[in-house]
């Protein structure tokens, strides 16, 4: 009798997208849950990013943009405000006098500027009625507002994901049939652990995976505690180190390094293996590219298309310190492109059959996926 195998499954946002969940950054940005009108310099910066191609923005792009924003600050110890001194003086008068009598009519250019920046809001017409919803936060320091803005992004994203959360129905998707295959593999006696970098639940209608442990690397929206930030190997002024993932009070990621080391098989679905999560994967892939002490592991990576496949290989090249050939020679990793299954159908078939899927049913699955 064969010994049970240890299988580690790593999920990224591509997994949720393959299940047809609207979990792109663009989906969140276009929703009412995104705090894009909050008067913080950070929000103003993010609103200017990717105006023509938000549909292509990945979550790691957002995390990288947090770093770009920090690097754009002339003096991080003071921050950089979007509100000018004249606008601040006008806001202070609003605080003192309100909008009565339209005293600000000779400063409408400043009023319009503040409206455009999301600091003041219209409350109907005419323009003389602006100011009724003065945002008191606007008078606080830009650093204070940026820190609150990041918290609002997390809160808004949690609420957005809860609003779209529902059991996944039986579907024709590679992600769905991966879950079915994992369920059958666990029932056959192998040990499986799922490590997800998503904030969503791993569940699907009519099929329970309760016996498979699921570890959320960066929190989950059910608990209302999620981690968004840039990588923690950077030097930042203490005023802005709240942008680092590791500085979040909720940051207690489970150990993934040891399970990867002990695994017989590693399955990755929809994760870019990008720079911001490099610390989790680099030790594993560097070890698997060691010709002096070769230990083969089964590695299967599900990604979307040719472009994402190239990005994956570039990430692996970097994590193995240029030993991509050694990684391939020792382990023979398999990359399956979910949007190119016509070309990769044999790879998908072999994967399903190797994970306790009936051969006839595996053929049916491939047929449905190719429709």
Regions found by a protein language model. Name each.
Residues 11, 27-30, 215, 219-220:
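Conserved beta-strand -> loop -> alpha-helix junction used to position metal-binding or nucleic-acid-contacting
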Residues 17, 27-30, 62, 71-72, ...:
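Intrinsically disordered, low-complexity regions enriched in small/polar residues
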Residues 33-36, 219-222, 238-243, 291-294, ...:
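Glycine-rich loops and low-complexity Gly/Arg-rich segments
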Residues 39-254, 259-262:
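Extended, H/D-rich, highly charged conserved domains that either
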């Amino acid at each position: 009798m064969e010994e049970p195998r240890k299988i580690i499954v790593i999920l990224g946002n591509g997994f949720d997208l393959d299940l047809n969940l609207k979990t792109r950054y663009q989906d969140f940005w276009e929703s009412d849950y995104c705090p894009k009108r909050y008067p913080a310099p950070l929000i103003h910066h993010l609103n200017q990013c990717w105006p023509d191609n938000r549909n292509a923005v990945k979550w790691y792009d957002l995390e990288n943009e947090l770093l770009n924003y920090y690097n754009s600050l002339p003096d991080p110890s003071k921050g950089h405000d979007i509100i000018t001194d004249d606008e601040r003086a006008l806001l202070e008068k609003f605080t003192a006098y309100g909008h009565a009598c339209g005293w600000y009519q000779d400063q409408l250019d400043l009023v319009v500027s503040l409206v455009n920046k999301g600091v003041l809001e219209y409350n109907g017409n005419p323009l003389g009625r602006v100011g009724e919803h003065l945002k008191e936060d606007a008078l606080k320091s830009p650093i204070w507002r940026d820190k609150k803005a990041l918290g609002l992004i997390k809160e808004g994203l949690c609420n957005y994901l809860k609003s779209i959360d529902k059991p996944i129905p039986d579907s024709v998707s590679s992600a769905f049939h991966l879950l079915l295959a994992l369920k059958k593999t666990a029932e056959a006696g192998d040990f499986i652990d799922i490590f997800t970098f998503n904030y969503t639940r791993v569940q699907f209608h009519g099929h329970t995976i309760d016996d498979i442990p699921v570890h959320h690397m960066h929190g989950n929206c059910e608990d209302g505690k999620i981690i968004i930030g840039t990588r923690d190997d950077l030097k930042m002024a203490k005023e802005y180190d709240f942008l680092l993932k590791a500085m979040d009070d909720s940051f207690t990621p489970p150990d993934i390094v040891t399970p990867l080391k002990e695994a017989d098989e590693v399955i990755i679905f929809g994760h870019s293996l990008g720079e911001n999560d490099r610390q989790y994967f680099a030790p594993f892939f560097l070890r698997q590219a060691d010709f002096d002490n070769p230990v083969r592991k089964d590695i299967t990576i599900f990604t979307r298309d040719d472009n994402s496949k190239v990005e994956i290989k570039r990430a692996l090249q970097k994590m193995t310190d240029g030993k991509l050939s050694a990684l391939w020679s020792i382990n023979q990793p398999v990359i399956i492109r979910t949007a190119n299954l016509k070309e990769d159908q044999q790879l998908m078939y072999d994967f399903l059959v190797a994970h306790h899927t009936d051969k006839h049913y595996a053929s049916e699955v491939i047929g449905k996926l190719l429709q």
